[in-house]
């Protein structure tokens, strides 16, 4: 008798054999029918946007099984250029009503196939309406491939008249929206009608599964064929309140290549000259963006304009030259964001919610995108949640100021992106808040070591032998510097007393004059005493400068005598004991003698 464990293993193996293989369409899935399909092909820009409103019916046909999913197919000619595929239930207005889509395979059939999971299984005889949105890049080909500056741009698009599907279609219509009314040619299947820039095909009846019939249109399209060939988006997160974003962008005009020379004169004079070229475009930045900069290889580009709106910041980017077909340019845009709008935490758990790619220009196409998210030093247990598939490279380390073991860098790649990819990714990580003190402590430690080193250095004697003469010269120089300072201070006392005398002559207030005299005597005595002390120190050091200081002291005594004499003369003038003419003559003589003495003192100071 077999053990219960063996029986359980056998049962699990049987169930695994009966289950459908992941990534392949189940052969047991009930057949469905496209009861009605309304296709809209928007070719008004450089993208091909195809929207199909499909009414799916579960015909039953003796089958009682319910359909929990259905299969979408893409033509082999367009599958490699698919940028976005989205499926929604028609009529539902919820923001997140996209159905789950997974790529699958069907044996014996070319093209790409996707399994779409229905929110509610479809019973036999019931129906459901879905909206399928697809966006294709680089499927509008310029024809001719080269044009002159004055010519208009024409493009060719090739697709399928029919809704390519693994299910039969009962009725189908197709509406094609073009960029202009100027149409060179288009296929005439089913006698389509044309109105201005719109072509209407159908209705087509009873279309078998996997039906293909080439649809081709050749028309004028002067919309900007602007492509981001390569873009690197760097997001640097700081727990000190800031998130820095920088985008390195390589742009190329992928329309018809310019043939012949470029005339800026004609370009400025004629409005329709270079009609398919690109003068400028607008980039929408987050509303909280600040410290915005825009530069290229040369430097800052001053032709850009910034407009702050309620819900965004609009930046007009104008390259240094207009972009014609085949022309390229490179630029860098950067800005700062407050972290409280994008960074959330609960204890040591952090979550960064930011856009994987942001708006660069309307109808944008990005061939290759690299996103680098620089987290704070010490971030661990990093997990990334993305709304769509992205490729991850091994994490890197980034070193900047005060880093010790490096900041972790998440590196992610994706190709062929459009506006529908402007969605948020969430980065989860853990971070010990104690590490926020690391950088301030490093700064404190660095200054402490610097000051301690300087203190030790100035106290060390690195000379091999001592030089008494050099030390004596240094002492004399130090004393001389102090003497110069004191002499200048003493001369300043005289100037201040002169101002006091002038005020006395105007106000006739004798108390002002007496107070000035007393202040002069007190401060002059103190300064002169200090100079005498320094003079004795010079004599002790054996310097001949001692005699010059002594001579300067004698000259200063004469200057002081003249200053006090001038005050006495002013006193007599105010008292009416001296005529004004006599006073002015005496004052002139006194000033001349005083100036001569001060000049001699200055010469001695220069000699010191």
Swiss-Prot record:
Glycans are attached at residue 300. Pfam families: Ribophorin_I (PF04597). GO terms for cellular component: cytosol; endoplasmic reticulum membrane; oligosaccharyltransferase complex; oligosaccharyltransferase complex A; oligosaccharyltransferase complex B; rough endoplasmic reticulum. Residues 1-25 form the signal peptide. Belongs to the OST1 family. It comes from the Eukaryota. It is a single-pass type I membrane protein. Ubiquitinated by the ECS(ASB11) complex. Ubiquitinated by RNF128, leading to degradation in a proteasome/lysosome-dependent manner. Ufmylated by UFL1 in response to endoplasmic reticulum stress, promoting reticulophagy of endoplasmic reticulum sheets. This is Dolichyl-diphosphooligosaccharide--protein glycosyltransferase subunit 1. The keyword Plastid does not apply. It comes from Mus musculus. Component of the oligosaccharyltransferase (OST) complex. OST exists in two different complex forms which contain common core subunits RPN1, RPN2, OST48, OST4, DAD1 and TMEM258, either STT3A or STT3B as catalytic subunits, and form-specific accessory subunits. STT3A complex assembly occurs through the formation of 3 subcomplexes. Subcomplex 1 contains RPN1 and TMEM258, subcomplex 2 contains the STT3A-specific subunits STT3A, DC2/OSTC, and KCP2 as well as the core subunit OST4, and subcomplex 3 contains RPN2, DAD1, and OST48. Pathway: Protein modification; protein glycosylation. InterPro entries: Ribophorin_I. There is a cross-link at residue 539 (Glycyl lysine isopeptide (Lys-Gly) (interchain with G-Cter in SUMO2)). It is found in: Endoplasmic reticulum membrane. Residues 459-608 are cytoplasmic. Subunit of the oligosaccharyl transferase (OST) complex that catalyzes the initial transfer of a defined glycan (Glc(3)Man(9)GlcNAc(2) in eukaryotes) from the lipid carrier dolichol-pyrophosphate to an asparagine residue within an Asn-X-Ser/Thr consensus motif in nascent polypeptide chains, the first step in protein N-glycosylation. N-glycosylation occurs cotranslationally and the complex associates with the Sec61 complex at the channel-forming translocon complex that mediates protein translocation across the endoplasmic reticulum (ER). All subunits are required for a maximal enzyme activity. The gene is Rpn1. The chain crosses the membrane at residues 441-458. Keywords: Acetylation, Endoplasmic reticulum, Glycoprotein, Isopeptide bond, Membrane, Signal, Transmembrane, Transmembrane helix, Ubl conjugation. The modification N6-acetyllysine is found at residues 188, 539. Residues 26-440 are lumenal. One of its GO terms (biological process) is protein N-linked glycosylation. The lineage of its organism: Eukaryota, Metazoa, Chordata, Craniata, Vertebrata. The keyword Phosphoprotein does not apply.
């Amino acid at each position: 008798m077999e053990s219960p464990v063996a029986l359980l293993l056998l049962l699990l193996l049987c169930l695994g054999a009966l289950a459908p293989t992941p990534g392949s369409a189940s052969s047991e899935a009930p057949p469905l029918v496209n009861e009605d399909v309304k296709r809209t092909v928007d070719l008004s820009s450089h993208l091909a946007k195809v929207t199909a409103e499909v009414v799916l019916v579960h015909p039953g046909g003796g089958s009682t099984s319910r359909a929990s999913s259905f299969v979408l197919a893409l033509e082999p000619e367009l599958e490699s250029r698919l940028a976005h595929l989205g499926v929604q239930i028609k009529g539902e207005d919820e923001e997140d009503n996209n159905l789950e889509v997974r790529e699958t395979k069907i044996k014996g059939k070319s093209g790409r196939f996707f399994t779409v999971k229905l929110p509610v299984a479809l019973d036999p005889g019931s129906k459901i309406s879905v909206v399928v949105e697809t966006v294709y890049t680089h499927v509008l080909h310029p024809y001719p491939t080269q044009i002159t500056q004055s010519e208009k741009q024409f493009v060719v698009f090739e697709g399928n008249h029919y809704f390519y599907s693994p299910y039969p279609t009962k009725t189908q219509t197709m509406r094609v929206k073009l960029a202009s009314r100027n149409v060179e040619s288009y296929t005439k299947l089913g006698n389509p009608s044309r109105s201005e820039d719109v072509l209407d095909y159908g209705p087509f009846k009873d279309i078998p599964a996997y039906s293909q019939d080439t649809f081709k249109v050749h028309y004028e399209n002067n919309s900007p064929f602007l492509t981001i060939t390569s873009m690197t988006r760097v997001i640097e997160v700081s727990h000190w309140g800031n998130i820095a974003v920088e985008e390195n962008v390589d742009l190329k005009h992928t329309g018809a290549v310019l043939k012949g020379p470029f005339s800026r004169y004609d370009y400025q004079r004629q409005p329709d000259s270079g009609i398919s070229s690109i003068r400028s475009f607008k980039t929408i930045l987050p509303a909280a963006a600040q410290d915005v900069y825009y530069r290229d290889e040369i430097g800052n580009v001053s032709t850009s304009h910034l407009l702050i709106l309620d819900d965004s910041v609009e930046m007009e980017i104008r390259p240094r030259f207009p972009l014609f077909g085949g022309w390229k340019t490179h630029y860098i845009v950067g800005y700062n964001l407050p972290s409280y709008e994008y960074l959330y935490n609960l204890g040591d758990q952090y979550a960064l919610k930011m856009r994987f790619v942001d708006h660069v220009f309307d109808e944008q196409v990005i061939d290759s995108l690299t996103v680098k998210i620089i987290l704070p030093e010490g971030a661990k247990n990093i997990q990334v949640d993305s709304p769509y598939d992205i490729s991850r490279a091994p994490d890197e380390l980034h070193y900047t100021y005060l880093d010790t073991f490096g900041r972790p860098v998440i590196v992610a790649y994706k190709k062929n992106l459009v506006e529908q990819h402007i969605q948020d990714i969430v980065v989860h990580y853990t971070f010990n808040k104690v590490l926020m003190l690391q950088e301030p402590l490093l700064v404190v430690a660095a200054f402490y070591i610097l000051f301690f080193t300087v203190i030790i250095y100035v106290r060390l004697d690195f000379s091999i032998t001592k030089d008494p003469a050099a030390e004596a010269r240094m002492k004399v120089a130090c004393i001389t510097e102090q003497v110069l300072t004191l002499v200048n201070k003493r001369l300043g006392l005289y100037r201040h007393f002169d101002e006091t005398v002038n005020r006395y002559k105007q106000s006739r207030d004798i108390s002002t004059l007496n107070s000035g005299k007393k202040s002069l005597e007190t401060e002059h005595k103190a300064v002169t005493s200090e100079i005498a002390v320094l003079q004795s120190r010079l004599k002790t050091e054996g310097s001949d400068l001692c005699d010059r200081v002594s001579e300067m002291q004698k000259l200063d005594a004469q200057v002081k005598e003249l200053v006090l004499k001038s005050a006495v003369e002013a006193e007599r003038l105010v008292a009416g004991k001296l005529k004004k003419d006599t006073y002015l003559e005496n004052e002139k003589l006194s000033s001349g003698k005083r100036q001569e003495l001060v000049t001699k003192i200055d010469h001695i100071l220069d000699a010191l």
